[in-house]
Amino acid sequence: MKQYAIQPATLEFNAEGTPVSRDFDDVYFSNDNGLEETRYVFLGGNRLAERFPVHSHPLFIVAESGFGTGLNFLTLWQAFDSFRSAHPQATLQRLHFISFEKFPLTRDDLALAHQHWPELAPWAEQLQAQWPLPLPGCHRLLLDRGRVTLDLWFGDINELTDQLDATLNQTVDAWFLDGFAPAKNPDMWTPNLFNAMARLARPGATLATFTSAGFVRRGLQEAGFTMQKRKGFGRKREMLCGVMEQHLMPTLSAPWFYRSGSEKRETAIIGGGIASALLSLALLRRGWQVTLYCADDQPAQGASGNRQGALYPLLSKHDAAINRFFPTAFTFARRLYDALPVSFDHDWCGVTQLGWDEKSQQKIAQMLSLALPAELASALNAEEAEQAVGVTTRCGGITYPAGGWLCPEQLTRAVIALATEQGLQTRFRHTLTSLVAQESRWQLRFMSGETASHETVVLANGHQINRFDQTRPLPVYAVGGQVSHIPTTPALSALRQVLCYDGYLTPQNPHNQQHCIGASYHRGDESTVWREEDQRQNRQRLLDCFPDAKWATEVDVSGNSARCGVRCATRDHLPMVGNVPDYHATLTHYADLADNKTSAAPAPVYPGLFMLGALGSRGLCSAPLCAEILAAQMSNEPIPLDASTLAALNPNRLWVRKLLKGKAVK
């Protein structure tokens, strides 16, 4: 099974206080004046001071090879803040920085390195606070209330650039070609990297690098850049600058999973749960006009209305896509929830998943073989598990120390209230019955007889997402479930973490002295009627898993307090995020896909119609990243996920997989 941890950098500090890589025997920045060198080489070499005021787009995208200590990023962020203060009315409003790092620093080493530049402390402290775990792939950090976005891609840049989604092609405005010197790290400075830089660069994009090595200049020229030498910084004689003057036409490697966005900035979101709320915020941050239509009279009346929900990543013993997506989604969710300027009941007390029988123990052993960072997930023996959770269990398991619980109902309402302050328009008691394409817009028809017209539409209405002609063929299904609310007792109040077994039990919410225990599972059932049998089973599953635990007998469901909801799920346990696919056109256009992959056209979709759904039972974990992915896609901005994992979230994936194998789609 693949290992999912990234090796951190090993470094030491020399006499000047400069960090030095033990792996590459090279400094992370100049001993003389690393800050001024960055300003000269990368900001000056890309002419950013003169380009920012005349940039004709709200977003400026910079890509970098080798994040290191983050000096280049912090220096650019500082300069961007100065520009925004001096030019508040400029078209350019936001900065997006994409960087690749094979050996990321630990948070402690990062903080030590940042002590070198006190003037960057206000920006460095924000970076340190959100510094991600060493997991492979993309980590999106939203900084300065979302005005600055940092995408940290952990892994080998030559491998990662081959895994980028095609939507990133021709989007980069400036390249910082940095890293350890070519003589120290020749594996990075390859034609593959130079070609990737050219593929990602938009026409007119610039690049700058500290080196003047001939093979670097020639490689970049062969990739498509027009190169020139410039006086180097300090004692260095020369450096290189370049411009992408050509109009390259990158090919699509998997057109059947291609994602299209919108040139428009106006949309209707259908739904009223956590997905709709977070998507509204993500689009508003990008300057969209957003109208939310909800069938209920207030938010969070569906699956997002529970009192307590567990937050922890889904891991799989066999599905690589799940193991790539959910750890990243979980860490993004924690960063986002912690940064939201709203209040909601929550406790990041940890989550422990126990192996109560042989089958569950085998599953946990396979999950632990992923070798995830200990800060994300680690093994517990029986004694350690009992110390962690605070009650007798007599079995070990896997613990997620950064997990916990939150109140989805409060969170959803608070986020929608925040979005409303930022310009969100809300329309409650609006039940959508049909969508009709009209020229370049969509007409929405509601049960009341009202209609509305919007340039784009996002369906994020839970298990009702397949109620329309365009979405009826989607392979999603409803899952009804009941969560029981139980009063705490002295024994139950000892529970310190969310306990997962063949069900789950939360610690008490100190605001109401109640726990949540659940949940029943009724596939294909959309009923929200309270069931006495579900109430009994929620208790019985706990007793069956821990038959010797006296504290478990104190679970009292006789008060009949519970909440029934309906989730939307897929058989592969992954969300559906992206364009709504045209089922009939997909089957027609891709009828011979298995034999004609090289000539395939981009996937047939309904223009301007998007979806965010099938979050299953892990919506609290997946909704934040899914909302960010869809907002980025709709806005034609960089998407924070590799192409393979994005394909696993594509709403057409289950059909396309069969068509690629020449199998019939049913």
Curated annotation (Swiss-Prot):
InterPro entries reported for this sequence: FAD-dep_OxRdtase, FAD/NAD-bd_sf, MnmC-like_methylTransf, SAM-dependent_MTases_sf, tRNA_MAMT_biosynth_bifunc_MnmC, tRNA_MNMC2, tRNA_S-uridine_synth_MnmC_C
Catalytic activity: 5-aminomethyl-2-thiouridine(34) in tRNA + S-adenosyl-L-methionine = 5-methylaminomethyl-2-thiouridine(34) in tRNA + S-adenosyl-L-homocysteine + H(+)
Chief location: cytoplasm
Cystines in this chain: none
Annotated region described as tRNA (mnm(5)s(2)U34)-methyltransferase, given as residue ranges: 1-245
Domain of life of the native organism: Bacteria
One function term, GO molecular function aspect: oxidoreductase activity, acting on the CH-NH group of donors
Keywords assigned: Cytoplasm, FAD, Flavoprotein, Methyltransferase, Multifunctional enzyme, Oxidoreductase, S-adenosyl-L-methionine, Transferase, tRNA processing
Official protein name in the record: tRNA 5-methylaminomethyl-2-thiouridine biosynthesis bifunctional protein MnmC
Organism encoding this protein: Salmonella paratyphi B (strain ATCC BAA-1250 / SPB7)
